[in-house]
């Protein structure tokens, strides 16, 4: 996502966003200042959120929630996480108030993150074989309302 953002910024001339730093400053009580924010604070929030939410995508994959549909769901979680933090701290405004181009760029970058993270998480989880959800679905392929749970393992 970061590489894609940097390429997009070169092409569009869009400046760096300091929203991640401002959110972290408000969450932690760090002092705020106008204008450009310290790069380490910006990156700490940027990469910290990515790492923490990446764990969630890994849990999804290990559980058997894999593939593009799971990555799309995760992308929504990633977008929602940003909006909760930005709006709760007063740093951001609801996306419905943003210019459409800014909204499109944000959604695009989060989608890249969501699908790349999903591909990596899915590949790593696949090394352990099907997840519990996939094993359950394989017992009776298709859509069924009466699919009971898998038996407990090790008992």
List where the protein language model places each region:
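Short amphipathic, positively biased membrane-proximal segments
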Residues: 1-155
């Amino acid at each position: 996502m970061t590489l894609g953002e940097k390429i997009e910024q070169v092409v569009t001339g869009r400046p760096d966003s300091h929203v991640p730093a401002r959110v972290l400053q408000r969450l932690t009580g760090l002092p705020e200042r106008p204008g450009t924010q310290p790069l380490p604070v910006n990156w700490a929030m940027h990469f910290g959120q990515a790492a923490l939410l990446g764990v969630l995508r890994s849990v999804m994959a290990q559980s058997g929630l894999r593939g593009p549909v799971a990555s799309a769901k995760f992308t929504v979680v990633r977008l929602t996480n940003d909006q909760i933090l930005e709006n709760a701290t007063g740093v951001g405004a609801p996306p419905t108030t943003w210019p459409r181009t800014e909204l499109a760029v944000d959604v695009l970058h989060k989608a890249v993150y969501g699908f790349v993270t999903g591909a990596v998480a899915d590949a790593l989880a696949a090394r352990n074989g099907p997840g519990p959800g996939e094993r359950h679905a394989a017992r009776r392929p298709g859509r069924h309302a009466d699919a009971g749970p898998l038996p407990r393992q090790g008992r």
